[in-house]
């Protein structure tokens, strides 16, 4: 099913960041800088013209329809439904829980500065026995609300929900759902290396220097180099921590992508949430103006199925971060009485991360990608989770 994994160095950072977040929450002017947060990994805000019904592209997991009478609450990251990525994946998961397990659910989204996260968590806890919070910036508030509502289960995406001083879960009713983003990124990096015609590829990160998005970059880089160490990789981040605007800056991502294509890249991977829309716009414009096709690689959801139709043909693949499955499994475990506090990590071995094949653009290299996947799962390839 899934496995419990503890990553000391990365989770210590998250612990420190949670403490920092608690301090920041006391100062409204400072917390206002978090106008767009990481979602799943990397939470993302939706752009204009998004499909508010997007999200349920993948097939639902199997399950017994034993959730009749059970309700669940879902609190999105800023932007809510329609971000074509992180939030939509969470929405797909709870929609699957409704259709497969038979639950009912309610949902809410924070205000623009995220200052009402705690209130939304409490509101959902007042009405539901399990609450899912999308994004690690909920962790501090979720710990507090969980302590005040011991009969309600809470699950937070992208935070371990561990008490590092005590050496165990932060609360008996709080679960942290994390992902091996570097493993999935390795596979799309390998895909980029196998598909590039120019010998140059690019990576756009949303926010630098707080340890999470570097996992995407490290895995992507390792995958590229595993295929061909001579391929050139151009990398750029939109903003640096603690400025989270990089996850909601499609114009800036487009500008960066255009520069990368101008410098010879023909495939660019983004881990930038809602900013990724700008990458696909750039790919379309360059392809149409130059007559030579360039590509973008999506993240979190299968973005071939979530982006605007006009840019769909420029989505080579997406690194799938199965937030949908994590949400579904958390609700299923609550119903079954097997809810597990603390960190649950999802990786390649349980299809918690992966790559998409929509569009058929990878059909000729799937066997090679599956061979890499098998080697990672078997432990023959160790994928780095940092750029060090």
Per-region residue spans from a language model:
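C-terminal motif of bacterial Sec signal peptides marking the signal peptidase cleavage site
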Residues: 41-44
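Hydrophobic helical h-region of N-terminal Sec-dependent signal peptides
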Residues: 33-37
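A residue-level marker of the well-folded mature domains of exported/periplasmic proteins
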Residues: 50-388
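Bacterial N-terminal signal peptides that target proteins for export
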Residues: 23-32
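Short, Lys/Arg-enriched N-terminal segments with co-localized hydrophobic residues
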Residues: 1-23
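Short, conserved catalytic or interaction motifs in soluble domains
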Residues: 47
């Amino acid at each position: 099913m899934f496995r419990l994994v503890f990553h000391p160095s990365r989770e210590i950072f998250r612990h420190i960041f949670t403490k920092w977040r608690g301090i920041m929450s006391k100062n409204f002017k400072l917390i206002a800088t978090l106008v767009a947060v990481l979602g799943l990994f990397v939470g993302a805000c939706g752009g204009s013209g998004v499909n508010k019904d997007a999200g349920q592209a993948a097939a639902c997991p199997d399950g017994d329809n034993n959730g009749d009478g059970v309700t669940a609450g879902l609190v999105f990251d800023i932007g809510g439904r329609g971000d074509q990525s992180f939030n939509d994946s969470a929405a797909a998961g709870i929609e699957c829980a409704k259709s497969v397990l038979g639950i009912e659910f309610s949902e809410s989204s924070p205000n623009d500065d995220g200052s009402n996260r705690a209130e939304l968590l409490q509101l959902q806890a007042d009405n539901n026995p399990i609450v899912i919070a999308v994004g690690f910036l909920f962790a501090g508030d979720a710990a507090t609300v969980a302590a005040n509502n011991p009969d309600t289960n809470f699950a937070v995406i992208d935070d371990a929900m561990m008490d590092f001083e005590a050496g165990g879960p932060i609360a008996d009713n709080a679960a942290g759902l994390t992902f091996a983003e570097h493993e999935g990124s390795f596979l799309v990096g390998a895909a980029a290396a196998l598909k590039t015609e120019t010998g140059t590829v690019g990576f756009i990160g949303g926010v630098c220097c707080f340890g999470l998005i570097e996992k995407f970059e490290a895995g992507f880089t390792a995958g590229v180099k595993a295929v061909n160490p001579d391929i050139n990789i151009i990398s750029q981040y939109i903003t640096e921590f603690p400025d989270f605007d990089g996850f909601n800056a499609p114009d800036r991502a487009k500008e960066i992508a255009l520069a990368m294509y101008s410098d010879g890249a023909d495939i660019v991977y983004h881990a930038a949430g809602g900013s990724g829309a700008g990458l696909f716009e750039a790919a379309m414009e360059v392809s149409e103006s130059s007559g030579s096709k360039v590509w973008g690689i999506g993240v979190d959801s299968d973005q071939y199925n979530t982006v605007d139709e006009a840019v769909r043909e420029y989505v080579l693949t997406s690194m799938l971060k199965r937030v949908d499955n994590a949400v579904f499994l958390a609700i299923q475990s609550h119903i079954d009485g097997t809810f597990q506090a603390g960190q649950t990590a999802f990786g390649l071995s349980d299809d918690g991360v992966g790559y998409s094949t929509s569009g058929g653009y990878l059909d000729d290299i799937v066997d090679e990608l599956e061979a890499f996947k098998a080697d990672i799962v078997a432990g023959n390839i160790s994928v780095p989770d940092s750029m060090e």
